[in-house]
Amino acid sequence: MAKGKERHMFPGGNTSKGFFSYYDFVLPQEKAKRILILKGGPGVGKSSFMKKIAAGLCGEGCDIEYMHCSSDPASFDGIVFPDKGVAIIDGTAPHIIDPKTPGAIDEIINLGQFWNDEGIIENRDKILATNQQTSELFQRAYRYIQAAYSIYKDNEVIYNKAMNHGKANVIISETVDRVFEGIGISEIEGKQRHLFASAITPEGLVNYLSSLITTQERIVLKGNPGTGTERLIERIRSAAIERGLYTESFYCALNPIRLEHLIIPELDVSITTSNEFHNADVKPTLEIDFNEFLDQDMLNKYKEETKFNRKEFETLLNRAIKTIQQAKEKHDELESFYVPNMNFSEVQKCQEEILKRL
């Protein structure tokens, strides 16, 4: 049997607004038949639990979506089997998830039942201290990211000022007409899904665009911050919703409310932003460079400012990444208090039982 299709993304991210969650869109309740919520402390085997179930079902030909952890991309915060309407999600901090439709859709799997309470209690003070240190490191990282974004925004203002928005509006209108040619307005609004394709992680900037931008039509947008690439994507999304089409929106790792990539599965169309921070390694069917509409004379007046901003942004972002690395090291230390006190043979039995049910 052929292996199922794999897609990779992030349900949450380390952003200028702190940890930002789109976990409600991992598998919306209206599409779900069963959502298993894993509970338990660090090191109890939640990610390994999901990996083994994913390997079992993917080998049987099931399509799968891997929801990576922005604080450790090698780990999973969730897996989704779209055709089955099934998801398994890590429901512990910082993305605490509780059942919304208990029994009918949602079910809690508590891996904490398989640990040795006495062994963990013995390390109580160390666990509390390490938890506190991890939290402090993440908060510091978020302050660095917020500072980096403030500088990034200054460049946005400069490029926006130099932009010929009239010419950009013409291109935006022409592209919307191209995507929706012959498709009328619907009486029913299209459904939406919101996630991240990229994240600021201990490994640096990581993106999974190559697993997502696989449609027949691939519109690639280029342009400096402030040139208006997001305006085009937002216009296309709005038009898709008006026509009753389902959309998948993927947001900026730095600013989690800024739209950067859009997929319209029913039209087999993707619109993706390509820049120095993330690039989809795909051959575009249409490429639009918004930098062509910039007033170069005006940019030359602010050359020193934009150069300074870019350098300081990179310095602060790299500092944030280093701090997230330190937080991961502390989290790994936290796991070391739980791993020796886990009965992993019982966890494996639980995993095998879940796999049979699915």
Enumerate the language-model features and the residues they cover.
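Charged, compositionally biased non-catalytic regions
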Residues: 22-24, 29-33, 41-42
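A cross-family "folded-core" feature that marks the main globular domain of proteins
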Residues: 38-39, 49-50, 65-68, 92, ...
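Acidic/polar active-site rim loop that often engages polyanionic ligands
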Residues: 119-126
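Glycine-rich phosphate-binding P-loop
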Residues: 35-54, 206, 214-240
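Conserved nucleotide-sensing/catalytic segment adjacent to the nucleotide-binding pocket
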Residues: 2-20, 55-119, 239-318
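Long, K/E/R/D-enriched contiguous segments that form extended
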Residues: 353-355
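N-terminal pre-Walker A segment at the start of P-loop NTPase domains
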Residues: 1-27, 166-210
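An accessory alpha-helical subdomain
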Residues: 126-179, 308, 312-351
